[in-house]
Amino acid sequence: MMGDGEAIRVYVGADRSQLLAVSVLEHSIKRHTNAKLQVIPMVDLPVPKPLDPRNGQRTGFSFSRFCIPRLAGYKGKAIYMDADMLVFRDIRELWQIPFDGAKVVIQREVKHQETTTRKEGAPSKRIKQCAVMLLDCERLNWTIESLVSGMDDGKYDYEQLMYQLCVLDEADVNYGIPFEWNSLEHADADTRLLHYTDVYTQPWTYAGNPFGDRWFAEVRLMLQDGSLRGSDLRREIELGYFRPSLVRDIRFGHLVPGFLRRGFDLYNRGADKAAGFIAHKAVYEAKKERGRAIQEYLERTGGTSAGGV
């Protein structure tokens, strides 16, 4: 394990479209701690494709968390986070959660199902996930090649790997991260980390996320302290990664009274549509391509599976 004087290492799973979101996350982490910190984006890592496309990554970084021990030199411990997050408390609180003999620490429970699943773009049920993890890199001998080979050999499938961590014994998994450190589409006075997990309504691509004001406020602080320039924001918009109306939200959103907010959001959504903006276009194109690859695979194999599904 790392000593007290060593940096807290936070590895962030992302693709190119989320790099600015990583910067916003990093800013929020640093703003709430004076600990030594390293935030390492994981973008376009060399990850082999499983033979069965049904076992392929759902995003460009789904398997990135399993690359962390090797990236860390199999030394010390590390935190994994997704890019679509914002932190409101000292990261040391998460860092100091004990492993209690386990190799990883993941989320304990999923709260507020009854309200967050009613939100536009939300799933019907939220599952326990590993979007925030503590990893003891010294005790995890993972290589992404061997993990993908396990799927190719039919030992497990994507869901078993990602959601059940089937490559670990149950004793190696500590369910010690409270919901407040992976608060799915929910924020209150106890929230430590807000996770904008619903792709359809992330505040940089959708006008109307009920907790988008937190993200906009962080961006305003970055513009004020010089860690972000207006030209950086405009570049992401020009590339199609962020919605055109985001600039209006950043500039004026905090000045809009509550009773006018819905109209403001509807206006922004209309403006984005008129501008031809398609949220997460590359993600949805990749999803379609994955569907085609699965169909071709099933036709070629007669419906048999090389990945245990």
Feature names for model-found ranges:
Residues 2-8, 35, 41-42, 136, ...:
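A glycosyltransferase accessory/donor-loop signature
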